[in-house]
């Protein structure tokens, strides 16, 4: 998903906002694809939330994509509802697509929260989830990408030209595990 979204939204020479600390693949794939990385800091004294004042002081004119990851890897920090609301407002103000990589939500939270619960988030945000963590299916490569129909069509155009899909048996097993909440 990280590759597909980056290919769909970022051209060489454009910028990607990446959390520090954060999942290294956001940086490595963006660099491979010719994007410039702009790190934004997550600090413990701020609950591992983005510092929106710091972000607003950056030159964001070439930023196309912003990665977030809540619950955060490697800190374990959880987003707050206010953080998600501010991310949506930030994305709309600066015409940036925010992607929340959310694979740990079902195992680290009693009440999982989604960025897409914020009104208007689907206009400017994408959210991933993965069954590799929540249902112990690593290597099956089964996950979810949720957004608006236009964004999804762009991502699917990239995906369909990279691979031919997941084996049907794996899809059926994943659907059953998800529907019955069988980890």
Regions found by a protein language model. Name each.
Residues 120-183:
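Conserved core segment of the aminotransferase class I/II
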Residues 14, 35, 93-97, 121-123:
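A short helix->loop->beta-strand "cap" motif at the edges of active sites that frequently abuts
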Residues 8, 28-30, 90:
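Hydrophobic/aromatic ligand-binding patch that stacks against planar heteroaromatic rings
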Residues 4, 26, 87, 115:
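Aromatic/hydrophobic pocket-lining residues that form π-stacking "cages" and hydrophobic walls in ligand
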Residues 38, 42-113:
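Active-site phosphate-binding strand-loop segment of PLP-dependent enzymes
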Residues 1-15:
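Phosphate-binding glycine-rich loop
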Residues 13, 58, 85, 177-183:
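Short, intrinsically disordered, charge-balanced linker/junction segments flanking boundaries
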């Amino acid at each position: 998903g990280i590759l597909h979204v980056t290919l769909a939204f970022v051209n060489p020479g454009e910028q990607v906002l990446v959390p520090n600390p954060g999942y290294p693949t956001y940086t490595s794939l963006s660099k491979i694809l010719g994007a410039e990385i702009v790190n934004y800091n997550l600090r413990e004294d701020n609950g591992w939330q983005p510092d929106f004042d710091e972000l607003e002081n950056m030159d964001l004119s070439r930023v196309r994509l912003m990665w977030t990851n809540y619950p955060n890897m490697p800190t374990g920090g959880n987003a707050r509802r206010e953080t998600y609301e501010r991310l949506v407002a930030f994305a709309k103000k600066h015409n940036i697509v925010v992607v929340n990589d959310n694979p740990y939500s079902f195992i680290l939270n009693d009440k999982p929260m989604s960025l897409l619960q914020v009104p208007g988030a689907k206009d400017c945000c994408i959210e991933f989830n993965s069954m590799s963590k929540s249902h112990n299916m690593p290597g099956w490569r089964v996950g979810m990408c949720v957004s608006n129909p236009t964004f999804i069509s762009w991502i699917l155009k990239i995906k369909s030209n990279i691979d031919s899909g997941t084996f049907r048996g794996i899809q059926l097993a994943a659907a059953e595990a998800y529907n019955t909440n069988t980890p």
